[in-house]
A protein has these predicted regions:
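Charged, low-complexity, helix/coiled-coil-prone segments
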Residues: 5, 98-110, 206-208
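Alpha-helical transmembrane segments
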Residues: 122-134
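Intrinsically disordered, low-complexity coil/linker segments enriched for acidic/polar
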Residues: 81, 120-121, 259
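Juxtamembrane transition segments at transmembrane-helix termini in multipass membrane proteins
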Residues: 1-14, 19, 23, 53-77, ...
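Interfacial aromatic "cap" segments that immediately flank transmembrane helices
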Residues: 13-45, 78-106, 134-186
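Juxtamembrane helix-entry segments on the extracytoplasmic side of multipass membrane proteins
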Residues: 120-123, 221
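Juxtamembrane "helix-exit" motif on the non-cytosolic side of transmembrane helices
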Residues: 109-118
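Transmembrane helix interruption/hinge and helix-loop junction motifs
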Residues: 48-52, 120
Length: 261
């Protein structure tokens, strides 16, 4: 199904976090063809160069979702200025990714310091990791603001306060979405794990001096497992983006209702 002007889905509408995820999953599944139409260059690039390819894919997807926020429906055709907007959104997606990397580095460094320098190191390290993760959780809302709005990057820092005000919904939403993505990625890595285990056993047997007969189609199996992994990765990113866009719109709708009251 492709969204048209007769089938509007308003993004900025107050919804529960569970409703955002349910609607995000169904909308992402219904518009898989539209997403492919808008993002196929980055998908093909990711098969060869995963890192820049995935960033460009996220940028193209964010641009599509921003148009959905403005129009009320997911546009089937890409606008003429779409490539320029793709580059703009890819840069904002890269900024969002760098924020996540910075937060992970800070949490990891503090966890390591707690384990090394504090008594009961392992216990204190676990406590530090949990506490810092909960403190940093509102940053998720800030990264959504970076990806789905046109606000200048310094202004997007206010998204942290927005996430703090809606901390309960953000925590429940993040945990549920994390479990869904975990299931998707476990399914995607299953073929690759089988291929890796078989390759490791064959390599160990060869080192032990045994004669190992490698199937003729084995290289194709390795390539197929890699492609399957990328497909599931794209699926997880797409589901996350659709759900995040709806959750971001829902939070903004709640904020607008509070201001009116």
């Amino acid at each position: 199904m492709e969204t048209n002007t007769e089938n509007h889905i308003k993004v900025r509408e107050a919804r529960s976090y569970a409703r955002c995820i349910k609607l995000g999953l169904s909308t992402a599944a219904d518009h898989a063809g539209v997403v492919w139409t808008h993002t196929w260059p980055s998908v093909l690039l990711s098969l060869v160069l995963p890192f820049p390819g995935l960033i460009i894919f996220i940028g193209q997807l964010d641009r599509l979702l921003c148009e959905w926020s403005e129009l009320g429906f997911v546009p089937r055709r890409k606008p003429l200025e779409g490539w320029r907007m793709d580059a703009h959104r890819s840069m904002r997606a890269l900024v969002s990714l760098l924020v996540f990397v910075f937060i992970i580095c800070v949490i990891g460094s503090c966890t390591w310091a707690a384990m090394v320098y504090l008594p009961h190191g392992k216990l204190m390290a676990m406590a530090a990791m949990v506490i810092l993760t909960l403190v940093a959780l509102p940053s998720v809302m800030m990264t959504m603001e970076v990806e789905y709005s046109d606000s200048p990057l310094p202004v997007c820092r206010a998204g942290w306060l927005t996430g703090f005000r809606h901390y309960g919904s953000l925590l429940a939403y993040s945990l549920l979405l994390f479990m869904i993505n975990l299931l998707i990625m476990l399914a995607g890595t299953f073929p690759m794990n089988i291929v890796t285990m078989a390759s490791t056993q064959a390599w160990q047997a060869a080192l032990a001096g045994d004669t190992v007969m490698t199937p003729t189609m084995w290289p194709l199996a390795i390539i197929a497992s890699y492609i399957i992994f990328l497909i599931f990765t794209f699926s997880a990113i797409t589901v996350t983006a659709f759900c995040n866009n709806l959750f971001w719109g829902s939070i903004h709708a709640r904020e607008a209702e509070k201001k009116q009251d």
